[in-house]
């Protein structure tokens, strides 16, 4: 998925080189559970795959996120979005992510890696006090078991490798290559059974809402 427009021509050559250098470093030595997807034709459109952290409702999911650099980057923070549907207090319906690092706590020297690690941490420790999804924030504070069940259901429906077109972040293929197709083939029967079960569970939950 590419951005509708690009700010690449508005960034200084120095900023472009700095961003590409950082992306290439992350591609060579990726942070744990994060795989950056480099778009060499447009460094203002950055995408990455984040593993759902163990012990959270997002565990076993793979979430695609997008950072869009504006013309004033790094003086101003990028916009961050989940492209994978997720039930989370700090993620709006359009996928926009609310985190202080990208607002009042932004510093020009933080870098792309720091942003992606912050987003991963947000999956571990949501902040219901600054919720973009008020329903999720309220549910987390008042009925955590219901919140966890809903978030887990969304993860199982939308954040599976077959949905993202990837295997795992360690060997992800963004181009639908052989390993992706092999993985998808092995998982197809399991995915079909899981889908039936999840649809039934979803219908039951919707009746209660």
Swiss-Prot record:
UniProt lists compositionally biased (Basic residues) regions at 200-209
Q: Which reaction does it catalyse?
A: S-ubiquitinyl-[E1 ubiquitin-activating enzyme]-L-cysteine + [E2 ubiquitin-conjugating enzyme]-L-cysteine = [E1 ubiquitin-activating enzyme]-L-cysteine + S-ubiquitinyl-[E2 ubiquitin-conjugating enzyme]-L-cysteine
Domain UBC core, by residue range, is 14-160
SMART domains, per the entry: UBCc
Broadest EC class? Answer: transferase
What Gene3D superfamilies does the entry give?
Answer: Ubiquitin Conjugating Enzyme
State the Gene Ontology BP annotations: anaphase-promoting complex-dependent catabolic process; cell division; exit from mitosis; protein ubiquitination
Q: Where is the composition biased (Basic and acidic residues)?
A: 184-199
E.C. number: 2.3.2.23
Q: Does the keyword Cell cycle apply?
A: yes
Region Disordered, residue ranges: 165-209
This protein is called what? Ubiquitin-conjugating enzyme E2 S
Please tell me the species this chain comes from: Drosophila sechellia
């Amino acid at each position: 998925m590419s951005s509708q427009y690009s700010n690449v021509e508005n960034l200084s050559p120095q900023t472009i080189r700095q961003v590409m250098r950082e992306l290439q470093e992350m591609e060579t030595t990726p942070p744990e559970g994060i795989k950056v997807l480099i778009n060499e034709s447009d460094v203002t459109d950055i995408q990455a795959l984040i593993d759902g952290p163990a012990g959270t409702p997002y565990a076993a999911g793979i979430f695609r996120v997008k950072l869009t650099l504006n013309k004033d980057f790094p003086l101003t923070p990028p916009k961050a979005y989940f492209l994978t549907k997720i039930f989370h207090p700090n993620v709006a319906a359009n996928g926009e992510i609310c985190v202080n690092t990208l607002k009042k706590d932004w510093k020009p020297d933080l870098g792309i890696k720091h942003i992606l690690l912050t987003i991963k941490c947000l999956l571990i420790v949501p902040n219901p006090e600054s919720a973009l999804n008020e329903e999720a924030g309220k549910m987390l504070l008042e009925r955590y078991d219901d919140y966890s069940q809903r978030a887990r259901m969304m993860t199982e429906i939308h954040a599976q490798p077959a949905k993202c077109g990837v295997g795992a972040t360690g060997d992800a293929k963004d181009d639908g290559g052989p390993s992706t197709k092999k993985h998808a083939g092995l998982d197809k029967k399991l995915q079909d059974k899981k889908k039936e079960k999840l649809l039934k569970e979803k219908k039951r939950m919707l009746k209660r809402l």
